[in-house]
Amino acid sequence: MHVLLITQYFPPEIGAAATRWGDYVQILIKKGHRVTVLCEMPNYPLGTYFPGYKRQWVKQEKVSPNLTIIRSFAWANNRNSAIKKLGHYLVFMFSGLLTAFRLKNYHVLIVSSPPLFVGVIGAIISKIKSIYFFLDIRDLWPESVMALGEVRSKWVFNMGKKLESFIYKSTNGYILTVPGFKKHFTNHYPEQLNKPMINLINGVSNTFFDLAKKYDRIPEKRFAVLYSGNMGLAQGLESVIKAADILQKYPIDFKFVGSGVKQKALKTKADKLGLKNVVFLPVQKKEELIKLIKKASVCLVPLKNNPLFKKAIPSKMFEYMACGRPVIVSISGEVTEIIKKAKSGLISSPEDANSIADSILYYYNNRGKIIEQGRNGVMYVKENVRKEVLISHVMKKMQNAINKNSTL
């Protein structure tokens, strides 16, 4: 099958969005599928073009006989204001749409959202070219941006809902990163429930497992708590800084690895509290990040205490588990059931510094549980969320859906 994938973020960019399809595309290629990726000129998360790229309209990369990456113009900026963020999204929507018009001879179109504007490309292209269109939903926009306070205007929110409705009406099927997203359709778009809805969570690839096995665990000299990834509005990392303050008298270090809009504020807060047990590290390449994860004693998976995040399943959780690290999850919802089933961590109350600190102290005082629950996590990931198995299931479901609608 020849797949046209449209996603704003793609490697060498980093983050959950880029990693999701970066991994799945490689697996599809190995399984004999042909993939064309349409994405932005890489600039995320720092807002500057990656080495080897520049401000240009389009760049085509023939990676292999079965993989072509087409990078379209993007407004590279630091997205530190609503105007810059909106401009970043809209510029790719228009450049991506114009670039997509030239592409042909593919069997199915997959568009990954958010940003929601990428879905507009899929809606228009699928209509013009009469191609089967699957929308990959990684997060619920505009609800999530409203919940985080990035959008406060009801008018803007309502416009976002109209855009969402337009895109949904244009799709032939859905790929859901979180199974719980189906409830969103039940509550708001019940007419869409007759379309195929295929679950594809962010699991762990064989490549990641191989890298995790490659490096022996060399633990830090002191007990180490690690958070890696986006330091943004959704994570509620202020509560982790408070937990570090509570635990100052213990020989416990906190490591924050990554970047994001809240990083500066978190550093400032740590400095004001005089925290000597908190360290911030920049974004790391995958291999270096795996080394840091394996060095840690425990890893954190926090989110803000918002009903919207009850459906969230952060991909970093499975990566921590694959590295044999127990996780402290500060989320209420679907994730807690996974942790209970896997017996691979503890559950703390979201945005509750005392609860997070108590969970950290549990592992500090029970080192044997670190080994036991770490092993449980590895076993769970291997048996339940291997990306190779997950994407094979999706492709079969997609092919069945296309066959049933062959007159499209």
Q: What is the predicted function of each stretch?
A:
Residues 94-101, 117-120, 124-128, 154-174:
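Membrane-proximal helix-turn-helix segments that form the acceptor-binding/catalytic region
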Residues 180, 200-203:
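Carbohydrate-associated surface elements
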Residues 1-63, 202, 407-408:
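N-terminal subdomain of nucleotide-sugar transferases
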Residues 222, 251, 255-258, 264-291:
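Nucleotide-activated donor-binding/catalytic signature segment of Leloir-type glycosyltransferases, i.e.
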Residues 355, 362, 369-383, 396:
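A short, well-ordered alpha-helix in the C-terminal region of glycosyltransferases
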Residues 341-342, 346-353, 362-368:
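Conserved acidic donor-binding segment of nucleotide-sugar-dependent glycosyltransferases
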Residues 217-235, 240-244, 255:
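Conserved donor-binding/catalytic core segment of Leloir-type glycosyltransferases
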Residues 298-301, 319-322, 326-330:
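Short hydrophobic beta-strand element within catalytic cores of glycosyltransferases
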